[in-house]
Each structure stands twice: as C-alpha cells, then as structure tokens.
C-alpha cells in the first residue's frame, strides 16, 4: 500500500494521528479497520511509548498472537491458515506504524503458504442450484457465480445499485475502496426482477449478516455433498471465466484485484486442468496405437 502519510507529530496521541493520516491519505475502509485494530492491539500489549519499543517487545507481542484462540470457521487446516494470514496482516500494519514514527526496530513478516484454490465444476454447480428451493437462495448462488463478488460486497448491494436494463450492478463497498461494475446473465435477471418487486431503492438486496449467509451456503452444500462457502463461488466464477475466454486483465477488473498476480493464480489452475486433459487424451490415444 503506497500512501503518503506525512510526518508524525512530535508529541501527543500517535495512534489517532496514524489513523487520521491513513484516512487523509485515502486508505480504504478495510485497511483503516485492520490497521486500527492491529496497532491498538500492539499498543495495549506493550503498554509503553511505542518510540521506545524493543525487539523483545515485538517478539513477545507476536508470541501472544500465536497463542490466542482463533474464531474462524472451518477445518483445522483452514483455521490454522486463517490465523497465520491474520497475524501476517497485523505485523504488516505495525511495521507501517513503526516506520511512520521513525522507529528502526521492525518485526519480520512471516510467509503464509498459498491456499489451495477450489472451484466447482459444471455438474456440481447444477447440483447446488437444484438444491435451492427458494428464489432467494437460487438468486444468491447465481449472483455469486455470475459476478464473482465477495460475500461482504454482495451483502452491501442496494436495490438502487442494480441496473436491470444493462444487466449490471454497481459495487460500492469494495475491499480496496474503489467502486466497480459487475454483470449478470439474463437468467439471473429474471430472478432479480421477481425478487426485488416491491422493494425500495434504498433497501438492501439481501438483508443478511455474513454468518447467516455462510451457514446458508454450508447447508445447501451439505444437501449435495459439497463443501460450499462464499469464496468457493468466487473461485468458480474466476476459473470458469478464464475457461470461457475472458482475458486475465478483464478478469482482474471484474474481481476487483489491485495486483494482477492475485488474478494469475486462476490462470495456473486453468493450465493445470488443460495439462491434465492433454495427458489424459494422449495416454488414451497411445494405448490404442499399435507398437
């Protein structure tokens, strides 16, 4: 994140000054929330002037983060990775704060093993859609598959953000703070038109909390034997988009990735599929060819 935060005050409340500097510099809401939480946690732990922090203070703080119980849902591997990612972001935030106040001590940034990208195939998608008995549930699945929206982005969509004439949605509450446009199919438009009938422009499209959405998808997935979570549908959108010919730069814009390297993870997944199909086909043909 390349933001000009200016210089810190010589005295006074460094924490609030840092957060205000982030806001003035145009940091996204997600960044501000993360940095404020991480730096507050760090300051509460060391309980001293941060300009006098030592390497020992930093090591004790990181150790305390590692020993805390996480609140992430999922299996043990998923929980462990999520915790590692959170700690990494906390450390990045505190490093930025310490650099801003001209403290030379820096905590090392731990590496996090890349998470395996899972996506549904066409058969699994149809199974999930068939398991939806309510228009609302089917619309949620279709929108996530059509748009690749993050769960929190979907839950922030208002009725007025939807353009039925042009099959598009204006996404305002994004991870990087930048608005973007996403699109949906005619089939999804029919569901949308039916679902929003009678709703006001300022109404939320789905008046749900993240936990409620998460549990809803898990229940739907359980019906058909699939581990269904919001981000798996985002991965599915990205993977299918590339397979259907959308170029990686366009996909980057649709997904709202600042760094194209994040988007390129999906190109590797598609290449793996192509390689497997090639090897399967060549193996089959060679077995039929006489020596």
Curated annotation (Swiss-Prot):
Show the coiled coil region(s): none
InterPro entries recorded: CB, DNA_brk_join_enz, Integrase-like_cat_sf, Integrase_catalytic, Integrase_recombinase_N, Integrase_SAM-like_N, Tyrosine_recombinase_XerCD, XerA
Domain Tyr recombinase residues, every copy: 115-279
Keyword field contains tRNA processing = no
A molecular-function term among this protein's GO annotations: site-specific recombinase activity
The Core-binding (CB) domain covers 9-102
**A Gene Ontology cellular-component term:** cytoplasm
The record's section on PROSITE patterns has: CB, TYR_RECOMBINASE
Active-site residues per Swiss-Prot or TrEMBL entry = 150, 175, 231, 234, 257, 266 (o-(3'-phospho-dna)-tyrosine intermediate)
Which PANTHER family does the annotation name? Answer: INTEGRASE_RECOMBINASE PROTEIN MJ0367-RELATED (PTHR30349:SF41), PHAGE INTEGRASE-RELATED (PTHR30349)
Please state which protein family the record places this protein in.
Belongs to the 'phage' integrase family. XerA subfamily.
Q: Which organism is it from?
A: Saccharolobus solfataricus (strain ATCC 35092 / DSM 1617 / JCM 11322 / P2) (Sulfolobus solfataricus)
Compartment(s)? Cytoplasm
- NCBIfam families documented for this protein: recomb_XerA_Arch
Family annotation (Pfam families): Phage_int_SAM_4 (PF13495), Phage_integrase (PF00589)
Q: What does this protein do?
A: Site-specific tyrosine recombinase, which acts by catalyzing the cutting and rejoining of the recombining DNA molecules. Probably involved in the resolution of chromosome dimers. Binds to the dif site.
Looking at the record's lineage, which domain of life comes first?
A: Archaea
Q: Which UniProt keywords apply?
A: Cytoplasm, DNA integration, DNA recombination, DNA-binding
Record protein name field: Tyrosine recombinase XerA
- GO process terms (BP): chromosome segregation; DNA recombination; DNA transposition
